[in-house]
């Protein structure tokens, strides 16, 4: 029978519920417990796929093609659990499902209400997502007190009764703000947050208290007494310089023991050796490199969360401190590429919209002409093809039809047909809806023999996750290949171009990939493409005699 840990948050948002939930999952997994994670999002959007990165941050893509909350990325990076569509759902999805059932007559003419119909749908989805796990860690998005969260909180309250006391644990993350004029941490916001939860009918078993300094023993006792939890269950969560230290911090305070005791689980002792080794590698690098990250949303790095973490993972596995220099592509458009001169490698990530594209193309041109290691991901690959077409293949004005419909050389165009993960044919037109209409999820890619990509991956065939509508135009690909562009990877069956590179005698390391390799990187194994990229940056640094 699956047991549940429900994670809620109070006082303010963005306290790190996702990191706390992922860290608990990592500790429990090290004890031999099979865990999974769910994220319940109270917003009415169907998914974050069409939301602005400035509103929501990164959209994390799963193997089965779900566009999900970025917290699912944390769950996959911290544990071995694979996330899927069932692991993340929103108010929009819940209401959509209930309304469709009502239209089909499944409620037999009853008045459809929030309780029981919406809450029952939430409970059913939680159970479906938790199936097969020993422990399901369920994070409820938002902040206690928000009106949007109420149906979700009511649903988990009901599960607390229905599943039995030894099968459910409630963990509440809260904030203890420090008031400089008073010279102390304030517990009152936490007390009020717990009071809100208890009014709903949920009594937290564990309190995770975020603070920027150590919480005095007396304050912890006060919190325990006024919030009706055991003193040892008031866990101190101090700010850390790396999220990968959090599992160790929580384990030191016996969080996993408290959870196992509450859920009546007998398990072996936790072994966090792998996390300890990661921290050693992170804190004692042997090298340093500087990478230019040329993007559109660089003021909000949460938009590139998985990519930034993947670069950090590569640093861990190459014993390198990777210093990411964030550069706004619009600034490069206005001021030129001088800012790139002192850097060891250049990266252009995925993105949407025309704004800043010429700045990215200028950065790509600089990388190609100056033999600076270059990695282009999704749009970063497409713009590398555009730059090559314009400046090498003799196609002036070449562009993507996403940005210029009447370009004389549409080297990038809308994918009109492809096979999805199940082998079903997907079709799109320019008039298709924006939401949920991209080529999404895990896709197979065949790597060409003798290519750099093949040597990096060490395999003839790979599977990576996609999120895009546009692809290299096969009708113009032959001319690009004639001029020296190497198509290093293709999708079997459709022959879509998935990876490009330049010959070794032209450029030491120039790779573009249509997929998003960052979605499958984790701190324990890293990812071969990012590790190779950082090694290329180190080699470039050495060649320049730095």
Curated annotation (Swiss-Prot):
UTP binds at residues 13, 186-191, 222. L-glutamine binds at residues 351, 379-382, 402, 469. Allosterically activated by GTP, when glutamine is the substrate; GTP has no effect on the reaction when ammonia is the substrate. The allosteric effector GTP functions by stabilizing the protein conformation that binds the tetrahedral intermediate(s) formed during glutamine hydrolysis. Inhibited by the product CTP, via allosteric rather than competitive inhibition. The active site is at residues 378, 516, 518. CTP binds at residues 13, 146-148, 186-191, 222. GO terms for molecular function: ATP binding; CTP synthase activity; glutaminase activity; identical protein binding; metal ion binding. The keyword tRNA-binding does not apply. CTPSs have evolved a hybrid strategy for distinguishing between UTP and CTP. The overlapping regions of the product feedback inhibitory and substrate sites recognize a common feature in both compounds, the triphosphate moiety. To differentiate isosteric substrate and product pyrimidine rings, an additional pocket far from the expected kinase/ligase catalytic site, specifically recognizes the cytosine and ribose portions of the product inhibitor. PANTHER family: CTP SYNTHASE (PTHR11550), CTP SYNTHASE-RELATED (PTHR11550:SF0). This is CTP synthase.
């Amino acid at each position: 029978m699956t047991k549940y840990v429900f994670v809620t948050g109070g006082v303010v948002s963005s306290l790190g519920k996702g990191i706390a939930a992922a860290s608990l999952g990592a500790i429990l997994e090290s004890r031999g417990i099979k865990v999974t994670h769910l994220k319940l999002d109270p917003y009415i959007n169907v998914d974050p796929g069409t939301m602005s990165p400035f509103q929501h941050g990164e959209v994390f893509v799963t193997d089965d093609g779900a566009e999900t909350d970025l917290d699912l990325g944390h769950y996959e990076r911290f544990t071995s659990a694979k996330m899927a569509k069932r692991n993340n759902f929103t108010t929009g999805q819940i209401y959509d499902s209930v309304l469709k059932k009502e239209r089909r007559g499944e409620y037999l003419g009853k008045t459809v209400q929030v309780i029981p119909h919406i809450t029952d749908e939430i409970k059913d989805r939680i159970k479906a997502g938790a199936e097969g796990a020993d422990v399901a860690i369920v994070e409820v998005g938002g902040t206690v007190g928000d009106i949007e969260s109420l149906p979700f909180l009511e649903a988990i309250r009901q599960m607390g009764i229905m599943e039995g006391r030894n099968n459910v644990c409630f963990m509440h993350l809260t904030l203890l703000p420090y008031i400089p004029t008073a010279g102390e941490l304030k517990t009152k916001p936490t007390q009020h947050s717990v009071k809100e939860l208890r009014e709903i009918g949920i009594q937290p078993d564990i309190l995770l208290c975020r603070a920027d300094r150590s919480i005095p023993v007396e304050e912890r006792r006060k919190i325990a007494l006024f919030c009706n939890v055991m003193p040892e269950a008031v866990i101190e969560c101090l700010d850390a310089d790396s999220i990968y230290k959090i599992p160790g911090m929580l384990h030191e305070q016996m969080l996993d023991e408290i959870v196992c005791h509450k859920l009546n689980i007998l398990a072996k002792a936790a072994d966090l050796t792998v996390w300890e080794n990661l921290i050693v590698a992170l804190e004692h690098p042997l090298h340093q490199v500087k990478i230019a990250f040329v993007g559109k949303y660089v003021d909000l790095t949460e938009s590139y969360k998985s990519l930034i973490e993947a670069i950090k993972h590569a640093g861990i596995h190459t014993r390198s401190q990777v210093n990411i220099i964030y550069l706004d592509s619009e600034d490069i458009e206005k001021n030129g590429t001088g800012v790139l001169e002192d850097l060891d490698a250049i990266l252009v990530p995925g993105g949407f919209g025309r704004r800043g594209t010429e700045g990215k193309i200028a950065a790509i041109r600089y990388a190609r002409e100056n033999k600076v290691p270059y990695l282009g991901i999704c749009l970063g690959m497409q713009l590398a093809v555009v730059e090559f077409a314009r400046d090498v293949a003799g196609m002036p004005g070449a562009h993507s039809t996403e940005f210029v419909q009447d370009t004389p050389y549409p080297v990038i165009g809308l994918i009109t047909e492809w096979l999805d993960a199940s082998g079903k044919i997907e079709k799109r037109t320019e008039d298709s809806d924006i939401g949920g209409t991209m080529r999404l999820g895990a896709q197979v890619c065949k790597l060409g023999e003798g290519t750099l990509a093949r040597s990096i991956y060490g395999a003839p065939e790979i599977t990576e996750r996609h999120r895009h509508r546009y692809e290299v135009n096969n009708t113009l690909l032959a001319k690009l290949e004639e001029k020296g562009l190497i198509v290093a990877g293709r999708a079997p069956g459709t022959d879509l171009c998935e990876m490009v590179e330049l010959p070794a005698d032209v450029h030491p390391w120039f790779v573009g990939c249509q997929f998003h390799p960052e979605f499958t990187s984790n701190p324990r194994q890293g990812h071969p493409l990012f590790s190779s990229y950082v090694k290329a940056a180190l080699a470039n640094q050495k060649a320049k005699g730095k």
